[in-house]
């Protein structure tokens, strides 16, 4: 990968769902659970772009290709109030350690702040040391 490739960030669009679905399958494969992905791009288009969408996403783009994603949704706790939950954060291997994951994480954090969320939550598999190191360094 050339060092001067420009990476841009924007909210995901309905037309992005096939590429996002591919990244979700890539993530699930990494997590040793490719069989667990039961949704398809058409369902993602429906559920993510209806009047009250079930999820939102930010994408990282390089040369017109989505190279990273952050999928999230808003939740509510009767104890603590509104929250944003980061469901998936994934960057294709060639673009890791270049600030893409951090930028996507920050986009979700800011979305939570705009909605007056009290907290941001996510989960990491106990064996995924690179992800644990990534989140610890934030």
Residue ranges and their predicted role:
Residues 76-86, 96, 116-118:
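A conserved beta-turn-beta hairpin within the catalytic core of GNAT-like acetyltransferases
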């Amino acid at each position: 990968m050339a060092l001067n490739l420009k990476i841009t960030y924007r909210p995901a669009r309905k037309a992005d769902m096939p590429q996002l679905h591919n990244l979700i399958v890539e993530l699930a494969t990494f997590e040793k659970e490719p069989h667990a992905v039961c949704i398809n791009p058409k369902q993602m288009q429906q559920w993510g772009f209806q009047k009250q969408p079930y999820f939102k996403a930010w994408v990282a783009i390089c040369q017109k290709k989505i190279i990273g994603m952050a999928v999230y949704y808003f939740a509510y706790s009767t104890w603590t109030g509104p929250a944003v939950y980061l469901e998936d954060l994934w960057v294709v291997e060639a673009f890791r350690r270049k600030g893409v994951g951090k930028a996507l994480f920050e986009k979700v954090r800011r979305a939570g702040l705009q909605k007056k969320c009290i907290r941001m939550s996510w989960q990491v598999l106990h064996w995924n040391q690179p992800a644990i190191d990534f989140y610890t360094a934030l």
